[in-house]
Amino acid sequence: MTRFIFDLDGTVTKEETLPLIAKHFSVEEEIMELTRNTVYGRVPFIESFIRRVYVLGKLPVSEIADLLGKVRLYESLCNFINTHPENCCVATGNLADWVCQVNDVVRCEFFCSEGNIENNQVKKLTSILRKENVVNRYKAEGHKVVFIGDGNNDV
């Protein structure tokens, strides 16, 4: 079976989610620079992600989830995914608690980073998704894998 693995930011969504969160909460300057350097391969994804979550983790998780629940999506792609959920999944470094409302609309399996949430804030990252692990999992199961993404960390 062919498995289509989609990056979330800029692939399923029409905009990058971390800069959207940062702008909404007025912490965009630092996040924009980290995101830009990550997309262009200047800062390793893991290092950048930890730094971005440190900044954004102080913000209310429920408000971030509500904000991302309203993010603009590529409708045709979402229709494809929702028509073929058994062949599709989304792999994103975003925290599962942040993208849960997107997963309500894009109805396939989501692979996300995880964190401990206390008092509606991220207290600690517990796992950071490595997208290549999702690819390797499906290859090991004998699937043909097609990964669709737009950033350096999607290669």
Regions found by a protein language model. Give the residues of each.
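Alpha-helical substrate-recognition element adjacent to the catalytic core
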Residues: 2-112, 118
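Intrinsically disordered, low-complexity regions enriched in small/polar residues
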Residues: 6, 112-113, 140, 149
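Short secondary-structure boundary/capping elements
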Residues: 72-73, 126-130
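Short, charged, surface-exposed secondary-structure boundary motifs
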Residues: 117-125
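Conserved Lys-Pro-Asp/Glu-containing loop-to-beta segment of HAD-superfamily phosphomonoesterases
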Residues: 129-155
